[in-house]
Design a protein with these regions (language model features):
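Long amphipathic alpha-helical tracts in eukaryotic proteins
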Residues: 1-347
Length: 347
């Protein structure tokens, strides 16, 4: 009866604090591939416990996985990356990996022949960008990640992971992505058939923060596509599109292009409090709806700096005033007040 309870995909685990050292010792003995996989599976299970993560980090065991990156067995390489993925779900694990010498050999697995291994590597990299130091450490990989997107050889899940990593890196420093034709590449993704991919455009928003990025958005003629995405059925796609527009209309060319595209009515339509906004129970969707309103108000304030925009918005003041009179959210109230101040300003 007891034998039937043993999981054949896991290695036997020692009791207490001997568990982690024992499994790493087994890996160092270079047993056959099946035993290495079982040991790694058991380690993955243990890494869900913060105490085991701390023991692994402080005990110097992390560096021992480096040799497994070059293992001849693809499943072993994949399981090794899976181990790091679980470990980096903890802040101490992310910090330890960033402080180790594992990043260079780990990044070499981005070209691994196994798609499962490459996917696991991208999951680890995305986890590392949860820390600003992680995003900063991965900036040197931006050109390689951009190339992988451009080649379009990876499956959709991996493309989404790459876009998320690029987004975090670009918020840290947009220059590497901009230098590698990032606006053009990410602009191509705007019309991707997959909603999951279109949602990952915060990376384009990150590039549009700096002036060079704003100018490239205008030069690449991306604003018509972004304005069209304001009508997308997916809320997150709308939020990201408004975010890029919000940054781009702070330059004169962006203002004029958006006014020519008649974007004001669409942005104004996002401002009034809607029934679904009041009834929304999901906290994440409430956050996104708030971002949609805030970004729209800030874009309207920037467009009001142009004479043509101010003239049109003066007729729509009641829409904005309504969000200052009955609005409970202080961020939205202040943004609406700022927009009104710009619209009604006179020399």
């Amino acid at each position: 009866m007891a034998a039937s309870l043993i999981d054949p995909s896991r290695a036997p685990v020692a009791f207490g604090r001997r568990a982690v050292p024992q499994l790493f010792e087994e890996l160092q003995q270079r047993p056959e591939a099946a035993r290495r996989q079982r040991a790694l599976n058991s380690l993955c299970d243990l890494m869900h416990d913060p105490e085991r993560v701390y023991q692994t980090v402080t005990g110097g065991f992390l560096e021992q996985v480096k040799v497994l990156f070059q293992d001849e067995d693809a499943d072993v390489r994949t399981k090794t990356c899976d181990l790091l993925h679980v470990l980096t779900s903890h802040s101490v694990g992310r910090q330890a990996l960033l402080s180790s010498s594992l990043l260079p050999p780990l990044s070499q697995l981005l070209d691994d022949p196994s798609s499962s291994c490459r996917r696991s590597v991208h999951r680890v990299l995305k986890r590392l960008t949860l820390l600003p130091a992680g995003a900063d450490a991965l900036l040197t990989l931006v050109p390689k990640l951009m190339l992988k997107l451009r080649q379009e050889k990876e499956e959709e899940e991996v493309q989404a992971l790459i876009l998320s990593t690029l987004s975090s890196c670009s918020y840290q420093d947009p220059r590497p992505a901009l230098a590698n034709d990032g606006v053009s590449l990410l602009g191509h993704i705007l019309s991707h058939r997959s909603t999951n991919i279109r949602r990952r455009r915060p990376s384009l928003m990150a590039l549009s923060v700096c002036r060079d990025g704003k100018e490239q958005v205008c030069e690449q003629n991306l604003l018509p596509v972004l304005v069209g995405l304001l009508q997308d059925e997916d809320l997150e796609v709308q939020v990201n599109a408004v975010g890029v527009i919000m940054f781009t209309v702070t330059i004169t060319t962006g203002k004029q292009q958006c006014l020519d595209l008649d974007v004001l009515p669409v942005l104004l339509d996002f401002v009034p409090k809607k029934k679904e906004e009041e009834e929304e129970q999901d906290e994440e969707r409430r956050r996104r709806r708030k971002a949609l309103v805030l970004y729209s108000l800030r874009a309207l304030a920037a467009l009001a700096e142009a004479p043509g925009g101010r003239h049109l918005l003066l007729e729509q003041l009641p829409v904005l005033e309504a969000r200052t009179e009955s609005e409970e959210d202080q961020d939205i109230r202040r943004s609406a007040q700022s927009a009104i101040h710009v619209i009604t300003w006179t020399p």
